[in-house]
């Protein structure tokens, strides 16, 4: 959202550049909102402007096509990967997430649930993913594919719990709720 207009666009780009130069891990979710942009073309260009600085990226299937011009989200994920990120997660709503690195590509299925409101599902997924990612206390390059898949499973669990309730923020589950859900579902 901060890439939609100046001065936040320049500030975001500069912050990402400085963070990258300092060795920080850069996570990116373009969070495309059509009404905030003058055109779809401007949105695509603006959102693509920071991809080369990104280490881990989450996009929806729609965003992946918009940012790359590809016709499938699988091809789009590979094109995004070629632009800089080391890991791309393409969220697919109730179908789960496609997780792609240079060495791996795997569909991580969603947990089946009765969706009441999908507001916040993508943000919840990414928050859950990043929370699990950070819990490993490892550099991205040191993580195994199974650990990265576990991050996606956790993200899917958070999103699954989120869509069961109304409202984006009130529906976000606690860490204890997520862990209990994972324990009961995966046990």
Task: For each feature predicted by the language model, list its residue ranges.
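Conserved beta-alpha-beta core of the PfkB/ribokinase-like small-molecule kinase fold
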Residues: 2-79, 85-86, 95-96
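Conserved phosphate-binding/catalytic region of the ribokinase-like
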Residues: 17-21, 69-187
């Amino acid at each position: 959202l901060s890439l939609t207009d100046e001065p936040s666009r320049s500030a975001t780009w500069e912050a990402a550049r400085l963070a990258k130069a300092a060795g920080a891990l850069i996570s990116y979710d373009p969070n495309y909102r059509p009404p905030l942009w003058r055109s779809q073309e401007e949105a695509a260009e603006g959102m693509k402007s920071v991809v080369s600085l990104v280490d881990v990226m989450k996009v929806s299937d729609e965003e992946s096509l918009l940012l790359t011009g590809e016709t499938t989200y699988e091809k789009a994920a590979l094109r995004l990967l070629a632009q800089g990120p080391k890991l791309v997660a393409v969220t697919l709503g109730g179908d789960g997430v496609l997780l792609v690195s240079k060495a791996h590509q795997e569909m991580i299925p969603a947990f089946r649930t009765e969706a009441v409101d999908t507001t916040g599902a993508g943000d919840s997924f990414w928050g859950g993913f990043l929370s699990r990612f950070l819990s490993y206390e490892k550099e991205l390059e040191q993580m195994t594919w199974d650990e990265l898949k576990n991050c996606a499973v956790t993200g899917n669990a958070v999103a699954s719990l989120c869509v069961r309730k109304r409202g984006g923020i009130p529906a976000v589950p606690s860490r204890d709720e997520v862990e209990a859900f994972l324990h009961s579902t995966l046990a």
